[in-house]
């Protein structure tokens, strides 16, 4: 049984990774399973500078997932490189870094600070679902030109780039094409779906920032549709599928829609071991189905 997959130029030992923002900055999950047993650990998005994030409350559970407005809190790239990355490397994990910014210049600085990373860091996921403060706070991921500009400067990281895109736009297919043209080796689909919850007793928003990103099983059909549409339009563009993966079958579904690999996010809050369980569950599913190479699943629903 061959579980290896290829995402652009990046070879992974397996198709299942953690999703950024759900597995910490370092080896936080190492006490629950062998981090070297999964495809990669994708760390929480890193800014060029420390960032406090949004006011509390930051998380609200929903009937089929959760809303969050953490606001990309973190101590920045330099702290991560010196204080958190070493333990992650010592665990034997394959690592994917992640960067974010509020302006093109922020991405440029973060990418430059990530230059010359060890070879165990195989890629940099560029989180484009952030407000562009110079353009009315529209998300970078909603504008093909903004995506082009960010990826142009993010290339300074010296690693293969994966562009993480937002589902909250009708231009997703166009934006994905722009990301590929700008140098992204893959796109990660999808980031959270914008949502909101209100406490009917206090008549106030459940989250300190008001709105937040919805994740978990509720958004899985949205993720499948987005992956399917982008693969249909850009069959040569590798896709990392993410969104509501809580069981092996969900991961298989995203691969059949067109993903080359998948990420598990919100399910790790329910049980940090779910990433490893989904990975081993995919292997069992493939054996039952007579699938010899998991990579054969990619795009299988397109006929």
For every predicted segment, state its role:
Residues 1-95, 100-101:
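N-terminal capping/small domains of soluble enzymes
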Residues 11-17, 91-96, 156-167, 232-242:
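Short beta-strand/loop segments at the ligand-binding rim of alpha/beta enzyme cores
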Residues 18, 41, 80, 97, ...:
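Conserved, mostly hydrophobic/aromatic
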Residues 23, 98-101, 165-171, 220, ...:
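Glycine-rich beta-to-alpha transition loops that act as phosphate-gripper elements at the mouths
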Residues 27-32, 105-117, 169-182, 231-236, ...:
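Catalytic cores of alpha/beta
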Residues 38, 214-238, 246-303:
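Alpha/beta catalytic cores of nucleotide-metabolism and tRNA/nucleoside-modifying enzymes
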Residues 43-48, 123, 128-130, 186-196, ...:
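Glycine-rich phosphate-binding active-site loops on the catalytic face of alpha/beta enzymes
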Residues 66, 130-145, 175-237:
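Glycine/Thr-rich beta-alpha phosphate-binding loop at enzyme active sites
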């Amino acid at each position: 049984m061959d579980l290896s997959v290829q995402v652009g130029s990046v070879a992974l030992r397996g198709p299942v990774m953690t999703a950024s923002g759900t597995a910490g900055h370092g080896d936080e999950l190492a006490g629950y399973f062998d981090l070297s047993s999964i495809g990669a650990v994708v760390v929480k998005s890193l800014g060029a500078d420390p960032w406090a994030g949004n006011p509390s409350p930051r998380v609200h559970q929903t009937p089929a997932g959760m809303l969050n407005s953490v606001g990309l809190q973190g101590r920045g790239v330099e702290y991560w490189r010196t204080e958190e990355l070493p333990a992650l490397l010592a665990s034997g994990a394959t690592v994917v870094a992640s960067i974010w910014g509020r302006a093109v210049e922020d991405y440029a600085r973060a990418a430059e600070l990530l230059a010359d990373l060890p070879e165990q860091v195989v890629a940099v996921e560029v989180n484009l679902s952030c407000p562009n403060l110079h353009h009315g706070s529209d998300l970078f991921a909603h504008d093909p030109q903004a995506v082009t500009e960010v990826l142009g400067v993010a290339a300074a990281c010296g690693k293969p780039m994966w562009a993480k895109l937002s589902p909250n736009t009708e231009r997703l297919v166009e934006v994905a094409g722009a990301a590929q043209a700008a140098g992204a080796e893959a796109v990660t689909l999808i980031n959270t779906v914008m949502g909101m919850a209100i406490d009917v007793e206090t008549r106030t928003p459940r989250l300190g920032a008001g709105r937040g990103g919805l994740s978990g099983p509720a958004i899985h059909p949205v993720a499948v549709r987005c992956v399917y549409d982008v693969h249909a339009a850009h069959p040569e563009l590798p896709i990392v599928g993410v969104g509501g993966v809580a069981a092996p079958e969900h991961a298989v579904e995203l691969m059949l829609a067109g993903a080359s690999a998948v990420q598990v996010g919100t399910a790790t809050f329910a049980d940090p071991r779910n990433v490893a369980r989904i990975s081993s569950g995919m292997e069992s599913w493939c054996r039952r189905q007579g699938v010899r190479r998991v990579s054969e699943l990619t795009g299988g629903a397109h006929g």
